């Protein structure tokens, strides 16, 4: 997907796995917090940031020492990953600056003429991107809000906070996740107030 056009950024790649067990080969440590979240929300719209193992190339992690991993809820996506025999590192199937697609027709509209084929698994269960939570540090931090809310995460983990960059858009802070600093998720609609 990164080859579709210059609109997609390498730092926006998430590693998608078919099974929870696949994560063990990719990350340094899966602590109790990660196990609780994986058991509660996977497969589903939760991306977890871990300290990566050396097997994860810098071009996948954007040069960071962490990697963002999710297990999609869509069975067709998980079957495709399983058939590939390896996790798949890819961004959302959208053009940067546009919302991520939630229906097959959104992908067809955005990607028409840019890709050779589109595998349709059906519409998404949620209308927003996955929540991204960073577990690479002692305090769990939400890097990108999504359909799994701060409150839902707090019920499982106890203390969870929002990353300071979500509260203060400092251009000198390196983004840890897609959509934290850049123009992102902008619908093409006229709005009247």
Set out the residue ranges of the language-model regions.
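Extracellular interaction modules
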Residues: 1-5
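Active-site-adjacent structural elements in enzyme catalytic cores
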Residues: 6-193
């Amino acid at each position: 997907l990164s080859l579709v056009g210059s609109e997609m950024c390498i730092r926006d790649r998430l590693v998608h796995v078919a099974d929870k067990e696949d994560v063990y080969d990719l990350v340094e440590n899966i602590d109790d917090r990660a196990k609780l979240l994986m058991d509660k929300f996977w497969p589903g719209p939760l991306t977890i940031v871990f300290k990566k193992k050396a097997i994860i190339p810098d071009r996948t992690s954007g040069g960071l020492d962490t990697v963002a991993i999710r297990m999609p809820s869509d069975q067709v996506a998980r079957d495709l990953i399983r058939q590939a025999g390896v996790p798949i590192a890819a961004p959302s199937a959208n053009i940067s600056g546009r919302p991520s697609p939630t229906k097959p027709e959104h992908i067809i509209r955005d990607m028409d003429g840019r890709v050779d084929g589109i595998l349709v698994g059906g519409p998404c269960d949620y209308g927003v991107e996955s929540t991204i939570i960073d577990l690479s540090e002692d305090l769990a931090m939400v890097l990108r809000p999504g359909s799994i809310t701060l409150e839902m995460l707090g019920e499982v983990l106890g203390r969870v906070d929002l990353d300071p960059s979500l509260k203060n858009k400092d251009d000198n802070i390196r983004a840890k996740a897609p959509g934290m600093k850049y123009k992102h998720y902008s619908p093409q609609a006229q709005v009247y107030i």
